[in-house]
Design a protein with these regions (language model features):
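Sec/Tat signal peptide C-region and signal peptidase I cleavage site
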Residues: 19-23
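Cellulosome-associated attachment modules in secreted, modular CAZymes
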Residues: 666-729
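Bacterial N-terminal signal peptides
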Residues: 6-17
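Acidic/polar surface patches and capping/hinge elements
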Residues: 24-672
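N-terminal secretory signal peptides that target proteins for export/translocation
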Residues: 1-4
């Protein structure tokens, strides 16, 4: 018999071989980012905590690189007063090799030790800590580095000690940043207002105010990372607004108080819509309209209903617009799903997308799939991410997959300027994205905690408990009930198949036509619940029955906030609204991709032409998944828009301070629609010439490279002079 110790060693050797192969393809920063993502997958699903961990890991990687950099890139934490925490650093004591290869090796070693120490500290108590610790040990072995080296004396021992020192300092800072890490991020003031909901039992289990959040209590609970929960999870991070951010500023802050607790509201979205339970209303009521749309979209989760959609970029497009909260019905297609912009004037779906792929000049191919498959796949893909690393980690995975890997060796900041070495581009990209994701968590959860808004499972079941609100002469009338719509929401009568459902008299209750829920799935590998009539007080979101809905309030949508911020940031980072090559794809194989139930019924690829297309799909997925109504989505997008842009511009002042100042003063100049108008004043004149001359001869690309030769030279000057003193169209 082979002993367990030998099995572990054998596994480590195999993993070391795989890690070594990976190292030949990815930078050290990329490898350690993957280790953080894997640690997240092995932990509980805590988006706020993981956004902070990704941000802190990115700070360490960047500062380890910047400490050895001889250009004007600045450190963000090392040697700085970081939000009141001083991280001392004697830069004269650090030996910086003059040889470029030796300098890069020092950067890689420092990154490795810093990342190793941070992951050990942050994930040592995670449910799969043994796996995570094994992974990072194997990573260290693959790099032939000693895990037992713990010195922080960088003057004596150089790079490995610098990595240890930085991690030690950042871990200490983390105890002061308002996250309450020392008490495992426990709530410091918030108290739940409403009783827990027991979804396995019909109704809401005693919900009094339908505008407030309920915790989900289950007989058997597993979170979105697949971890077994032994008790009902409390609200995650209701006072996360207290955490120190990256690019958040006092001008973004509103201070508020509720129920004896103070809240920092960042980018305050204002109040959501509320239900007045004493006033009659139909679906013209904004609260009922919002939650009614969640039921309506639940009806789409049937791949056999005959509705086929072309989900290719030639059919679907998102232009980045965000509706006002009082004008949502002009943006979302309540009955048929998706955006109103996806339909023509006659109500026909599709054909409103991108005309051609700008990189190939060819039209995008059609991608016909059942609407029920598309809706189910995106609900699961974006719920867990490409591999269960929570929404902040989703976007690191997409950055890694399509940009850092896809464009290795060709990186240019903003798509302009000289080619940047992969390691430098990776650490700078991670810092910008990490800062944005961290600020998103702070801003979105500050609203979640203060507004304490209910989830659809509570709202829909609450209306169902109260009956119908359409006709006082019909049974079970109440102003707070569900409005009746023939064929969609009806009353159970004596002849109804549901009249004695569950061995109880159900006549007079309200039924809805929607996804039937987990009660109709015995074996998820082979069963599909489908769409049919169910009792409305038994409505389920399209999620695992052991999860149901996230353990925090709904307003605003974290997915919408994270995804919009990431899209804004990646547009700026790459200098293009399009994914590299004009297309990013993720495969959903037939009968293998879905976890909640069997499916999809055919193999297909999710496809996005632009970063905005992907962010929009992420946001909409939460409505098909039954997790958010539109009122949660639109304000989240708006917050994400501001956070993503602010985070990128702030990161740029750190990672490229000389270029950010030299080329336009507020970051690099964006590629202009009006060729030659570099300062954006609507004409080509002396101000543009001054900016042009600062880039002349520097190998700069982007708006100054008028003839697209990857250099700014005499031919570009001649082209600019031909445009001189002419207005933009």
């Amino acid at each position: 018999m082979i002993g367990l110790g030998r099995i572990w060693i054998l596994g480590a050797l195999i993993a070391t071989s795989a890690t070594t192969a990976l190292a030949q393809q990815h930078t050290v920063a990329h490898q350690w980012n993957e280790q953080v993502l894997e640690a997240i997958r092995n932990d509980f699903a805590r988006p706020t905590v993981h956004a902070r961990n990704l941000y802190h890991a990115s700070i360490l990687m960047y500062d380890c690189w910047a400490a050895y950099d001889t250009t004007q890139s600045q450190t963000i934490f090392l040697g700085q007063d970081f939000d009141g925490y001083l991280c001392p650093f004697d830069e004269m004591a650090l030996d910086i090799p003059s040889d470029l290869a030796a300098r890069k090796e020092a950067q890689e070693i420092a990154i490795t030790y810093a990342s190793y120490r941070l992951i050990r500290h942050r994930y040592e108590a995670s449910p799969q800590a043994e796996s995570t610790m094994g992974n990072i040990y194997v990573q260290m072995v693959s790099q032939e580095l000693d895990t037992a080296f713990t010195s922080t004396d960088y003057a004596e021992y150089g790079a490995p000690a610098l990595g240890n020192y930085l991690a030690e300092q950042l871990i200490a800072y983390g105890m002061t940043d308002g996250s309450n890490e020392i008490d495992d991020y426990a709530n410091t003031c918030y108290e739940q207002l409403e009783p827990n909901i027991l979804p396995e039992v019909p109704g809401t289990s005693g919900l009094v105010d339908p505008n407030h959040w309920q915790a989900v209590e289950l007989s058997f609970a597993i979170d979105q990372s697949g971890e077994l929960l032994t008790e009902t999870p409390p609200f995650l991070g209701p006072q996360w607004g207290e955490v120190t951010g990256f690019a958040l500023r006092d001008s973004n802050l509103t201070q508020a108080e509720r129920d004896g607790c103070s809240y920092n509201l960042w980018h305050d979205p204002g109040e959501p819509v509320y239900l007045d339970t004493n006033v009659y209303s139909g679906f013209e009521d904004p609260w009922k309209w919002n939650h009614g749309m969640v039921i309506s979209w639940s009806e789409h989760l049937d791949p056999t209903d005959g509705v086929m959609w072309d989900i290719g970029p030639g059919s679907l497009k998102y232009d980045g617009s965000i509706p006002a909260s009082d004008n949502l019905n002009s943006f979302y297609e309540w009955e048929n799903g998706g955006l109103t912009a996806w339909y023509d004037e006659d109500g026909n779906f599709g054909g409103q997308g991108h005309e051609v792929n700008p990189f190939t000049g060819e039209p995008y191919a059609t991608n016909m799939v059942p609407r029920g498959d598309y809706a189910r796949v995106i609900a699961e893909f974006w719920a867990d991410g490409p591999d269960s690393e929570t929404p902040p980690g989703h976007w690191y995975t997409l950055l890694n997959e399509f940009i850092l890997d896809g464009q290795a060796g060709q990186h240019r900041w903003r798509g302009q300027g000289p080619i940047i070495p992969d390691l430098e581009f990776d650490v700078k990209s991670y810092l910008a994205l990490g800062g944005a994701m961290h600020d998103c968590a702070i801003a979105a959860w500050s609203a979640k905690g203060y507004y304490d808004y209910s989830r659809p499972v509570s709202a829909i079941r609450y209306m169902a408990e109260h009956g119908q609100s359409s006709d006082p002469t019909l049974p079970n009338y109440h102003p707070a009930g569900l409005p009746l719509i023939p064929g969609f929401i009806e009353i159970v009568d004596d002849a109804d198949p549901l009249n004695f459902f569950g061995g109880e008299d159900q006549v007079g209750k309200v039924k809805v036509r929607c996804w039937k829920g987990p009660d109709y799935i015995e074996v998820p590998l082979i069963d599909v619940a489908g769409v049919d009539w169910i009792l409305a007080d038994r409505w389920w979101p399209y999620q695992r029955p052991s999860f149901v809905t996230p353990p925090f309030a709904a307003y605003v949508s974290g997915h919408s906030t994270y995804s919009r911020a990431a899209a804004e940031l990646l547009e700026l980072l790459t200098g293009s609204e399009y994914w590299p090559g004009g297309l990013a794809e993720w495969n959903a194989p037939m009968n293998q991709f879905l976890v909640f139930e069997d499916g999809p019924s055919m193999s297909f690829n999710l496809q996005w032409a632009t970063f905005m297309d992907a962010s929009n799909e992420s946001a909409l997925s939460r409505m098909w998944g039954g997790i958010h109504p539109p009122i949660d989505d639109a304000p989240g997008r708006r917050i994400g828009k501001h956070v993503g842009r602010n985070a990128f511009h702030y990161a740029e002042t750190i990672v490229f301070p000389q270029w950010a100042q030299e080329f336009g003063g507020d970051g690099f100049l964006p590629s202009a629609d009006c060729q030659g108008d570099f300062n954006g004043d609507g004409a080509r004149g002396s101000g543009d010439l001054i900016l042009f001359l600062t880039a002349f001869g520097l190998g700069w690309t982007g708006p100054y490279d008028l003839d697209n030769t990857a250099a700014v030279e005499t031919s570009d000057l001649l082209m600019f002079l031909q445009l001189w003193d002419t207005p933009c169209d």
